[in-house]
């Protein structure tokens, strides 16, 4: 289970896009898709049955979740997440560095 969720702001810590920030668009198993990160060129073949036009498309590709870290909004640095139980007894995601609750999108 991933500690990152759709809508989180993350920073890339390894790879060709190291240092860039973006918002999580999708999470699948141990891979993550981030807005504006890991742009690849896809050659799309036209298909009359579905009405898809052919051409060369630029789109985001999935990257491994170990190559990103959540961005702490207060410190503007990469951080890790842990879980704690709040006063109401619900499990909350918390930044490890300062103990603040992670804002959910």
From Swiss-Prot:
Which keywords label this protein? Ribonucleoprotein, Ribosomal protein, RNA-binding, rRNA-binding
Q: Name one GO biological process term.
A: translation
Q: Which domain of life is it from?
A: Bacteria
Q: Which CDD domains does the UniProt record give?
A: KOW_RPL26
MF term (GO), any:
structural constituent of ribosome
Q: Which InterPro entries match?
A: KOW (IPR005824), Rib_uL2_dom2 (IPR014722), Ribosomal_uL24 (IPR003256), Ribosomal_uL24_CS (IPR005825), Ribosomal_uL24_KOW (IPR041988), Translation_prot_SH3-like_sf (IPR008991)
Gene Ontology CC annotations of this record: ribonucleoprotein complex; ribosome
NCBIfam families, per the entry:
rplX_bact
- State the protein's purpose: One of two assembly initiator proteins, it binds directly to the 5'-end of the 23S rRNA, where it nucleates assembly of the 50S subunit.
- What does the sequence similarity comment in the record state about its family? Belongs to the universal ribosomal protein uL24 family.
Subunit composition and interactions: Part of the 50S ribosomal subunit.
**Protein name listed in UniProt:** Large ribosomal subunit protein uL24
Specify the species: Psychrobacter arcticus (strain DSM 17307 / VKM B-2377 / 273-4)
Q: What high-level taxonomic lineage is stated for the organism?
A: Bacteria, Pseudomonadati, Pseudomonadota, Gammaproteobacteria, Moraxellales
Q: Tell me the gene name.
A: rplX
């Amino acid at each position: 289970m991933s500690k990152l969720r759709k809508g989180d702001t993350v920073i890339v810590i390894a790879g060709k896009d190291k240092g860039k920030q973006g918002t999580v668009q999708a999470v699948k198993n141990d891979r993550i898709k981030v807005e504006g990160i890991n742009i690849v060129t896809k050659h799309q073949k036209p298909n009359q049955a579905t009405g898809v036009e052919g051409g060369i498309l630029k789109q985001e590709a999935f990257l491994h979740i170990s190559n990103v870290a959540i961005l702490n909004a207060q410190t503007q640095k990469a951080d890790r997440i842990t879980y704690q139980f709040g006063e109401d007894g619900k499990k909350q995601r918390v930044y490890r560095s300062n103990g603040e609750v992670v804002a959910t999108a």
